């Protein structure tokens, strides 16, 4: 799934490890989502949107 997770994370100055800690997942999970190799579960997608203060559809595109 296409996403702008890396750009949003970078805009806030967060490392992959910091975002992972905020989400309660591993750094490898963040890397996999950013590279489009892993589609997050719906609950994780909601957490990602919440951390960035936006809607799921603002971060992820089908």
Predicted features along the sequence, with ranges:
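A short, Lys/Arg-rich alpha-helix, primarily the initiator
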Residues: 1-11
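Alpha-helical residues within the helix-turn-helix
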Residues: 10, 21, 50
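DNA major-groove recognition helix of helix-turn-helix/homeodomain DNA-binding modules
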Residues: 24, 43-58
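Short, conserved catalytic or interaction motifs in soluble domains
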Residues: 35
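Phosphate-coordinating loops and pocket residues in cytosolic domains that bind phosphorylated ligands
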Residues: 61
